[in-house]
Regions:
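ATP-binding pocket architecture of kinase catalytic cores
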Residues: 22-140
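Juxta-kinase regulatory segment immediately upstream of eukaryotic protein kinase catalytic domains
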Residues: 1-23
Length: 140
């Protein structure tokens, strides 16, 4: 069974019907292999598959943080639809990353112009930081 088929089979256990021809892999993570793919409705998904059994237990604080932020900030946060020992899955966020990690060169590859950084990037980052700092203390 190919890795793509394994990913499809794993996702189907959670009623995610990822189209095989849409799957692409990101091997840069140490703890998770990440696959991107579209379901039959055209929704793009992020599928995180743990590389080792010990990884799952460390996802609980991450899940708590994601859930907390969704209730307390206005910027886009992943909405985990699956949080299981063999898969974390959520619809892909809009936009594009500023940079990605290339495992071959073991460094970042910029996806945006970064010399200098665009004003929109700086403004968006500043708005995000303000949003985080405005979380009421009683919510923390």
């Amino acid at each position: 069974m190919t890795r793509h088929n394994e990913i499809i089979k794993c996702a189907e256990k959670y009623q995610l019907h990822i189209q095989p021809q849409t799957i692409s892999l990101n091997e840069s993570g140490l703890d998770f292999q990440v696959a991107f793919g579209k379901d039959k409705h055209g929704v793009e998904w992020v599928l995180r598959l743990p590389r080792r059994p010990d990884v799952y237990k460390r996802t609980k604080p991450e899940k708590q943080t994601v859930d907390f932020l969704q209730k307390n900030v206005s910027f886009e946060i992943p909405k985990w639809k699956v949080h299981a020992k063999d898969l974390i899955a959520y619809p892909k966020l809009t936009g594009k990353p500023a940079a990605t990690i290339d495992p071959e060169i073991q460094n970042y590859v910029w996806e945006i112009e970064h010399k200098p950084l665009p004003e929109n990037f700086i403004n968006t980052l500043a708005e995000t930081l303000v949003d985080l700092h405005n979380i009421p203390e009683e919510n923390i």
